[in-house]
Amino acid sequence: MKAVSILSMRIKRGSPHIWVESIATRRAGFEPGVRFSVEMHGSGVLLRVAEDGDRRVSRKIRGESITPVIDINSQSDLAPLSGHESARVVFGDRRIFISPLASELRRRRRLVRLQEHLADGYLETSSIATGGGILSHALHAGFQDAGLYAQSKMCNEIRSDLAEHAMVHNDAFDDQTIMANLPLQELAFDDEVVRRLPEVDIVDLGLPCSGASQAGRSKNKIALPEHHSAVGHLIAPAIALLAKLNPVACVMENVTAYADSASAAILRGYLGDMGYEVHERELLGTEWGELEARRRWFLVAVTKGIPFDFDKLQPGEYPERQLSDVMEHVPLDDSSWSAMQYLKDKEVRDVEAGKGFRMQIYDGSERSIATLTKGIAKRRSTDPFFRH
């Protein structure tokens, strides 16, 4: 290969038209006046220098400069490129190969694979930054409700305790699931491992919110999510792994602030360029029958050509519940009860300092509870507590 470029495709007189004007044309041996043939070759068109070719290289003169030009305007010769706005041109030795963009070929491959899998009644999934696999389980449950079997091909989680717990207790994963228990940034660029990962239909993406959440920014004293030393850069390997998995659709959830991050902007841009349409929505747990008032940002990217409308996602009818309906009975003399005097004292100091931190104390009659954080076991001042 001597050169590669992307050229615009146009319609001229009702047929595809491509104009190749480049010094790379000369490097490939296509000098003005040289004859060449046009052949169908796989997903594209092969131009080959040939003495008996039925086409001839033209020329364009600018002052003393003469540039070879290939001008093809033919429905039959350019049939594989019909309907495309751009084409990839690879210049070789006495040959030029013109084909659809790699992103377009990948989009087509996704759709063909999806049709084949749906015909057999199943889908293949993978999960990135799985955690305990809550999002994976929800997706699989939804597919099952729709009459589709979902097979998890791979899940990636850095924490071994979460990964092993998910493999044992989460029925979204089974013996056919590749457990990639290593950092995402290691997995994405480990050629030996990645080449063994199959392309799938659906990927769920659960990147950590440690840098984007209000608590995370405050704790780590950072201005931007990307400043987080451990997780701020993970959008880069996530995109690299998405490119390998080439899913028909990707589902991501995170704290609402993530939507305004540079990482989210980069992800949107990549998905758009790779042939996806991106849909976003904030959802509140209590509107969907949950007791936890957890508000989250969701991104759903679907391959162009597949309809998707968030407005068709509507809450159902849910029975009214209160916290006491799901609380375990804890004897009043149990050692887990505590006066938490140090937290009460901290609240007094926070009030005096003009800070907004307050304890959240529930008695069980409430119909919702504030977001339960991953560090709730640490008994932090702003996490929910139940009154004795």
At which residue positions do the language-model features occur?
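C-terminal target-recognition/interaction regions appended to catalytic cores
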Residues: 2-3, 14-16, 23-24, 33-112, ...
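Beta-strand-rich non-transmembrane domains
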Residues: 8-13
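Short, well-ordered beta-strand segments enriched in hydrophobic/aromatic residues
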Residues: 18-20, 281
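Short glycine-/small-residue-rich flexible loop motifs, especially phosphate/cofactor-binding loops
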Residues: 22, 136, 268
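Short, well-ordered loop/turn elements at secondary-structure boundaries
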Residues: 32, 120, 150, 294, ...
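Core alpha/beta nucleotide-donor-binding catalytic domains of modification enzymes
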Residues: 113-246, 256-262
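Class I S-adenosyl-L-methionine
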Residues: 191-200, 212-379, 384-388
